[in-house]
Amino acid sequence: MLSPAMISLPWRPDAAEYYFSPLSSQPWAMLLHSGFAEHAHNRFDIIVAQPRATLVTHGQLTTLREGETVSTSAADPLTLVHQQLAHCNLQPQPHPHLPFLGGALGLFGYDLGRRFEHLPARADADIELPDMAVGIYDWALIVDHQRREVSLFSYDDPQARLAWLEAQTAPVAATFTLTSAWRANMSREEYGEKFRQIQAYLHSGDCYQVNLAQRFTATYRGDEWQAFRQLNRANRAPFSAFIRLDEGAVLSLSPERFIQLRQGDIQTRPIKGTLPRLADPEQDALQQQKLANSPKDRAENLMIVDLMRNDIGRVAEPGSVRVPELFVVEPFPAVHHLVSTVTARLPAHLHAADLLRAAFPGGSITGAPKVRAMEIIDELEPQRRNAWCGSIGYLSFCGNMDSSITIRTLTAWQGHLYCSAGGGIVADSEEAAEYQETFDKVNRILHQLES
């Protein structure tokens, strides 16, 4: 039950940026950021770097590196994460104010779901970022925006870690700039064909909802961290993240929690239903009411609430699944979202990894029934989703977990930047409106990088 040693650092609201900037070019440096958001879930920023071990999954194989030791395994990747956490033999009591006390933190890409469900392999796997990239970290710096505290903990020597942090200097980085226009991976006509194919599946009773996305690509040069800082300040998303890997980087501006686990309490907050913000306050308020009262958006949202109740119910204590919030409109800088909340209890004999596996990937970005929707996505979307629509988050030594759905997320790989956007299509969806929604969700991000 070893607890980490902890020191307090002077408060500054930009502490996460201040301490992470010099680390931002180091592989396995990762930042979970609450996006300076005026949002109920804007509380913690978490910085990690220099993991004691890493787990990287490509397809059927996971490579585990711990110091000089390298091994590979075809076992379930989340089982390997659980085993690696147990191997560290660090089981601190949960802290009253800090959610993360070291543990596994990183990326769980959408295509990791292929390890848990049998899916076809039609879509082109053209981005070679890992399906899972998770570090095991025995220290972290945490910024608590509610208590206005900056804490550094380590299971080794926090003063030595602070000295290391303060000795880091940011390399001189080339200014970030796009070197091409954004281009979509499907034309308007091709989107229409795919939309109508989904409608045929829906009307035949094959499925109830399918999330169809298009992907935008541009070339770039310069420092991805610069791009993230600009986007993060402009979009203020409560589940933002920056992940630096050997192969590339992931820049996430997600508004959506996937699953949180705190002392056995489970919470998931699926987003389904979107309308763009309007400049005129009165018109914007009407837009909120329109979304709140939209039968189509409420039906979409309810389908995913039922799906998440079912997924979480696979591992939750019987009778513990609840829906305390249904159809709440939350405003974000670019759009209004319709959000619901599902809660439950996790039995003491199960681990956060069991919960993550039971619900992965999140139903809000697949459709329902989930496996059939994922099959249709693989059939109709030209490329695999990779990091997009997976999760970024942590499984702490203390048993806690929190994770996002990686929407509004960019992948940087080999001089290319990829950004996808989709929407849930149901039987009464309108093709033109669904097509426009994909732009409403990411236009703000794409244009900010162009400028």
Curated annotation (Swiss-Prot):
Active-site residue numbers: E256, K272
GO biological process: folic acid biosynthetic process; L-tryptophan biosynthetic process; tetrahydrofolate biosynthetic process
Entry annotated with the keyword Thylakoid: no
Keywords for this protein: Folate biosynthesis, Magnesium, Transferase
Binding site for L-tryptophan: S34, H41, N42, R43, F44, P238, F239, S240
Metabolic or biological pathway: Cofactor biosynthesis; tetrahydrofolate biosynthesis; 4-aminobenzoate from chorismate: step 1/2
InterPro entries, per the entry: ADC_synth_comp_1 (IPR005802), ADC_synthase (IPR005801), Anth_synth_I-like (IPR019999), Anth_synth_I_N (IPR006805), Chorismate_C (IPR015890)
Highest rank taxon of the organism: Bacteria
Cofactor(s) listed in the protein's UniProt record: Mg(2+)
GO molecular function per UniProt: 4-amino-4-deoxychorismate synthase activity; magnesium ion binding
Magnesium found in the keyword field: yes
Catalysed transformations (reactions): chorismate + L-glutamine = 4-amino-4-deoxychorismate + L-glutamate
EC numbers: 2.6.1.85
Coiled coil: none
Subunit structure: Monomer. Heterodimer consisting of two non-identical subunits: a glutamine amidotransferase subunit (PabA) and a aminodeoxychorismate synthase subunit (PabB).
Family per similarity comment: Belongs to the anthranilate synthase component I family.
Functional note: Part of a heterodimeric complex that catalyzes the two-step biosynthesis of 4-amino-4-deoxychorismate (ADC), a precursor of p-aminobenzoate (PABA) and tetrahydrofolate. In the first step, a glutamine amidotransferase (PabA) generates ammonia as a substrate that, along with chorismate, is used in the second step, catalyzed by aminodeoxychorismate synthase (PabB) to produce ADC.
Protein name: Aminodeoxychorismate synthase component 1
Gene: pabB
